[in-house]
Every structure is written in C-alpha cells, then in structure tokens.
Regions:
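Conserved, structured core segments of small domains
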Residues: 2-113
Length: 113
C-alpha cells in the first residue's frame, strides 16, 4: 500500500518476449555480446525486485521469454528500456501479453481458485 496515495498496487502477470535487435552480433554467443556483464547485473536486479519471476532464451535462442509481474504494460516498457542491451539495440521488446496463471507453484492450489 502506498502511504501517500492510500492505494494498493495490484500486480498482474505478463508474458514478455524479447527479440534480437540490430545491435546483436549473430556471430557471437550470448555471453560474448557487448555489455553482457552490465545486462546480466541489470536483469539480476529485476529478478531481485520480483519484477522478473522467470525467464531465459527459448528455442534456438533467437528470442527470450520472461514471466513478469507488473502493474501494467507501461511499467514493463519503462523498466526494460533501462536495460543496457535495450540501450545498445541488442534486445527489443517483441510482445507483451497478459498471462492468466492458473497453475502456479508459488500459490498452493492455484488451479482450483
């Protein structure tokens, strides 16, 4: 609850797909991309904050899928825009979709609710 506003911030779950941008060097593995260390520290911070619940490359690694908890799409765009890889054009937001999590090990019995 925000003391100043007297409101409770409601978080929703989202599936966020990130795609390679023009700054991505296809000849280099993921951890050899420019600013890998800065990107990793930034993403770890988002996990520590509870913003990113889970995530990582999918398929052949051309895309990354994240389970994100946020107030809305604007918060997602704003926070991910600060990623060093976003600033360097390595990753772009592909899609952001609301995700109704009916099965969630973090919430016992979630499918029955």
């Amino acid at each position: 609850m925000s003391a100043a506003a007297g409101t409770v911030s409601v978080m929703a779950s989202f599936a966020v797909r990130l795609v390679h941008g023009p700054g991505w060097d296809a000849a280099r593995p993921i951890r050899a991309q420019d600013a890998w260390d800065q990107h990793a520290v930034f993403m770890d911070g988002l996990v520590d904050d509870g913003f990113i619940v889970a995530g990582g490359p999918v398929g052949a690694g051309e895309e990354t899928l994240h389970l994100v908890e946020a107030a809305d799409e604007n918060e997602i765009r704003s926070r991910l825009a600060e990623d060093p890889w976003a600033l360097g054009g390595l990753l772009l937001i592909g899609t952001i979709e609301p995700w109704a999590l009916w099965l969630d090990a973090r919430r016992a019995g979630s499918a029955r609710r």
